[in-house]
A protein has these predicted regions:
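Concave beta-strand-loop units of leucine-rich repeat
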Residues: 17-24, 33-45, 53-61
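N-terminal capping/linker segments that flank leucine-rich repeat
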Residues: 1-34
Length: 61
């Protein structure tokens, strides 16, 4: 699964993106208002530019 500008809204709740363990291989874009990013247990090899205000990043396998 690829997370793009077109479908990222499906994973956003408030200021959090949660896409843990859903087979994500690529995240194209992270909006500037995001404070928490949870993307563990996927097949990511890199992340896009992270927002300056990001507080929490959980991205492990």
């Amino acid at each position: 699964m690829r997370i793009t500008k077109d479908n990222i809204h499906e994973f956003i709740e408030g200021t959090t993106i949660n896409c843990n363990n859903i087979g994500v291989i690529h995240i194209e874009y992270i909006p500037d208002h995001i404070k928490n990013l949870y993307c563990s247990d996927n097949k990511l090899t890199s992340l896009p530019k992270l927002p300056d205000g990001l507080i929490r990043l959980n991205c492990y396998s």
